């Protein structure tokens, strides 16, 4: 399935006229883990294996791709088999993550970021320019978020209707290719709440930069985990909200 389709719309300015417009395609995706635990997502219909891999890592359901036994995809249903271990405990953290301050329990289970990476401000600006240039579907539809993982000269980028899924996809793609996340940074479009930052920290990425704002929970999570968080990356400026020593 394409990432977008063309529909009829009426444009109203000085007059009203029928015009063709492109809209982004979205689907409901289900992830079933070990035949039991199930989560539903709205996502763009591509790179579902990368999404599943990044989701499993970012939610702490596995510690590495070696813990993933298999991923099978059929009719927008993803069946993932993983090494079970302490799955019941991990499942409780995932299912409760968005309610009653559940992110605070999750952040206590995440170790501090272990990375000596240093990044020049100009590299952040260049990565953002490249990310925006790569966001073809966003330019056509205005309906996607975009995320990029930068590792030295390597640059991988995904668009998705969900900002969380876009980040899952770049993490999953990097993990499948054996990327050293401790030597990587993520740039993306979207707010930075705690659940997003915990996902990045679990992968081992030390820096995240967005053109949008952090939330207070995101600020607290970044401070606690040692993550360097940049917001409002626009033109030739940005704000550093935590652990500024990584930006030179």
Curated annotation (Swiss-Prot):
The keyword Transmembrane helix does not apply. Mo-bis(molybdopterin guanine dinucleotide) binds at residues 232-237. One of its GO terms (cellular component) is cytoplasm. It is found in: Cytoplasm. Keywords: Cytoplasm, Molybdenum cofactor biosynthesis. The active site is at 99 (cysteine persulfide intermediate). The keyword Cytoplasm applies. Its main location: cytoplasm. NCBIfam families: fdhD_narQ. Required for formate dehydrogenase (FDH) activity. Acts as a sulfur carrier protein that transfers sulfur from IscS to the molybdenum cofactor prior to its insertion into FDH. Belongs to the FdhD family. This is Sulfur carrier protein FdhD. It comes from Methanothermobacter thermautotrophicus (strain ATCC 29096 / DSM 1053 / JCM 10044 / NBRC 100330 / Delta H).
């Amino acid at each position: 399935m394409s990432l977008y389709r063309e529909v009829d719309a009426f444009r109203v300015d000085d007059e009203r006229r029928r015009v063709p417009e492109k809209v982004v395609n979205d689907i409901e995706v289900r992830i079933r883990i070990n035949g039991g635990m199930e989560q539903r997502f709205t996502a763009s219909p591509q790179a579902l294996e990368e999404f599943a891999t990044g989701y499993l890592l970012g939610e702490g359901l596995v510690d590495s791709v070696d813990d993933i036994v298999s991923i099978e995809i059929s009719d927008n249903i993803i069946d993932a088999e993983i090494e079970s271990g302490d799955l019941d405990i991990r499942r409780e953290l995932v299912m409760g993550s968005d309610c009653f301050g559940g992110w605070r329990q999750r952040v206590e289970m995440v170790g501090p970021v272990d990375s000596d990476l240093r990044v020049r401000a100009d590299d952040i600006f260049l990565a953002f320019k490249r990310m925006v240039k790569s966001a073809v579907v966003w330019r056509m539809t205005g309906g996607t978020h975009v995320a990029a993982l930068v590792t030295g000269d390597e640059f991988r980028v995904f668009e998705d209707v969900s900002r969380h899924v876009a980040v899952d996809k770049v993490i999953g793609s990097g993990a499948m290719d054996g990327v050293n996340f401790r030597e990587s940074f993520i740039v993306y479009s979207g707010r930075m709440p705690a659940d997003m930052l915990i996902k990045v920290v679990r992968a081992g990425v030390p820096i995240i930069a967005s053109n949008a704002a952090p939330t207070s929970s995101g600020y607290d999570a970044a401070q606690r985990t040692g993550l360097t968080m940049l917001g409002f990356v626009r033109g030739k400026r940005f704000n550093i909200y935590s652990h500024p020593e990584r930006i030179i």
